[in-house]
């Protein structure tokens, strides 16, 4: 026995499982209740007195066309608590009803006229058919937390299948209107026949609900579990959890991959309300070209939660890496090589990062040497007065980053005064509308950006080598000798 099914049902109904068994008359509703009680409920009642009383309250059932149930009946009269395999506690009560009258059924007329019956719903007697309808509606609306609709192909009663169509349509529509979770059982003497399979497909397409063909008289525990699982799938869907590859989770929320997934999910859930509608979501995701596989990882029926796995295509990871980094990567071997190189670069950058920030903000930054860069000379004995000591000398490179603002100007000759004014006017218009486009303005076959860049580079590389060496020595002397004053003469 699958305890999880009953545990999940218990969660969704807060432990009280009131099952309304409804449908047209002469479909096998009472038989379904009898088999349900015999297979699941009675064996799990601990109290022997309650067990005997419940057995006595099981409704009569029989074959043929004669209506056996004449009024709604609670089985047992009070909800009975059962414990399944000492793990799941449930309070169970089933509700049997007469059902909607079908043409060809017997027992609702006397002498060619409708039988009059007394009911708790009216002080006056009413026709059997009217009482049956009121009772059926009350079972559906007021006395059940879940529903089991029992239909038939007519083989169990000898009544023509066409006679059942109109009343079964009414029952299913009423359950849908009330949004009660329910399952549909097709009672037949030949559940595995081709004709039954065709009827099942026809009913599923017509009512848009799963239909379970079975011979109710021969129903076993496994069949009951299948019916209860079908009911669970008819409960509302409360939460959808999407499992993505970890690298996708690391992308920013507005990245096109995440945006596509979120948009698809929003579009897919518009018409989804029940757990069994999950195929609509799966279908929506399967249309995303960058996904390799989409599937349901797990369904937590007791909570109404569905976990969906989304697997991306293998090359998507490399495409996104290229998009983010600018490096062309076509496989793991290239990725490993790139990571190795970038790791070395990062280690070097980490050393100068702080100094670089200081240079940008304050104009000057220093990179202190690491322990590995220290170079020790041989120790020397030194004399100071009458005492002796040891002199230890160490050398290490330090980096000094200085910010020097470079200014330049471009003064192209464009012709006479009018032409110069026209050029100024044009450049001002571009600057006001789209400042960034100003740099792309064409000047004698080159963009303004290229002209300025050439001027800046020319200034950077015109500093003579000997001047650079002198500046280095000067800085070295200031650092080592601690001079706080410097006189600079530029010639």
From Swiss-Prot:
Its EC number is 3.6.1.-. Keywords: ATP-binding, Coiled coil, Cytoplasm, Hydrolase, Nucleotide-binding, Sporulation. It holds the Pfam family SpoIVA_C. A motif (Walker A motif) lies at residues 23-30. Disruption phenotype: Sporulation defects. Defects in proper coat localization around the forespore, but not in cortex formation. It is found in: Cytoplasm. It comes from the Bacteria. ATP binds at residues 23-30. CDD domains: Ras_like_GTPase (cd00882). One of its GO terms (molecular function) is ATP binding. GO terms for cellular component: cytoplasm; endospore-forming forespore; spore wall. It catalyses: ATP + H2O = ADP + phosphate + H(+). Changing residue 35 to E: Reduced binding to SipL. Residues 334-362 form a coiled coil. GO terms for biological process: endospore formation; sporulation resulting in formation of a cellular spore. NCBIfam families: spore_IV_A. ATPase. Has a role at an early stage in the morphogenesis of the spore coat and is required for proper coat localization to the forespore. Interacts (via Walker A motif) with SipL (via C-terminus LysM domain). This is Stage IV sporulation protein A. It comes from Clostridioides difficile (strain 630) (Peptoclostridium difficile).
């Amino acid at each position: 026995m699958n305890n999880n099914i009953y545990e999940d049902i218990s969660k969704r109904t807060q432990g009280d499982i009131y099952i309304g068994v409804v449908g047209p008359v002469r479909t096998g509703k009472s038989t379904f209740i009898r088999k349900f009680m015999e297979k699941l409920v009675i064996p799990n009642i601990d109290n022997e007195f309650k067990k005997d009383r419940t057995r006595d309250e099981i409704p009569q059932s029989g074959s043929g066309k004669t209506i056996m149930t004449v009024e709604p009946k609670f089985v047992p009269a009070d909800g009975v608590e059962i414990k399944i395999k000492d793990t799941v506690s449930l309070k169970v009560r089933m509700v049997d009803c007469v059902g909607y009258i079908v043409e060809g059924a017997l027992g609702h007329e006397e002498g060619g006229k409708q039988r009059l019956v007394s009911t708790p719903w009216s002080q006056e007697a009413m026709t059997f058919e009217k009482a049956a309808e009121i009772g059926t509606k009350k079972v559906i609306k007021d006395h059940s937390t879940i529903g089991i609709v029992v239909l038939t192909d007519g083989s169990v009663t000898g009544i023509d299948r066409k006679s059942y169509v109109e009343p079964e349509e009414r029952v299913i529509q009423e359950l849908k209107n009330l949004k009660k979770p329910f399952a549909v059982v097709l009672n037949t003497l030949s559940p595995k026949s081709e004709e039954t399979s065709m009827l099942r497909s026809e009913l599923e397409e017509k009512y848009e609900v799963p239909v379970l063909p079975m011979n109710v008289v021969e129903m076993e525990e496994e069949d009951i579990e299948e019916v209860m699982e079908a009911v669970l799938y008819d409960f509302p869907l409360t939460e959808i959890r999407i499992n993505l590859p970890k690298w996708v989770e690391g992308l920013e929320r507005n990245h096109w991959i995440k945006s596509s997934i979120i948009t698809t999910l929003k579009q897919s859930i518009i018409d989804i309300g029940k757990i069994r509608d999950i195929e609509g979501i799966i279908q929506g995701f399967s249309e995303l070209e960058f996904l390799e596989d989409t599937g349901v990882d797990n369904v937590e029926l007791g909570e109404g939660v569905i976990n969906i796995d989304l697997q991306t295509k293998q090359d998507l990871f490399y495409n996104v890496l290229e998009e983010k980094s600018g490096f062309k990567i076509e496989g793991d071997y290239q990725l490993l090589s790139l990571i190795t190189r970038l790791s070395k670069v990062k280690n070097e950058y980490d050393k100068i990062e702080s100094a670089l920030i200081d240079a940008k903000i304050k104009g000057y930054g220093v990179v202190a040497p690491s322990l590995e860069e220290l170079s020790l000379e041989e120790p020397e004995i030194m004399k100071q007065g009458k005492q002796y000591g040891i002199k230890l000398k160490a050398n290490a490179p330090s980096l000094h980053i200085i910010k020097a603002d470079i200014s330049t100007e471009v003064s192209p000759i464009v012709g006479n005064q009018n032409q110069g004014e026209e050029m100024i006017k044009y450049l001002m218009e571009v600057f006001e509308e789209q400042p960034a486009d100003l740099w792309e303005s064409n000047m004698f076959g080159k963009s303004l950006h290229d002209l300025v860049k050439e001027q800046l580079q020319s200034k950077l590389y015109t500093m003579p080598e000997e001047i650079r060496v002198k500046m280095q020595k000067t800085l070295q002397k200031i650092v080592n000798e601690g001079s706080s004053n410097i006189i600079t003469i530029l010639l």
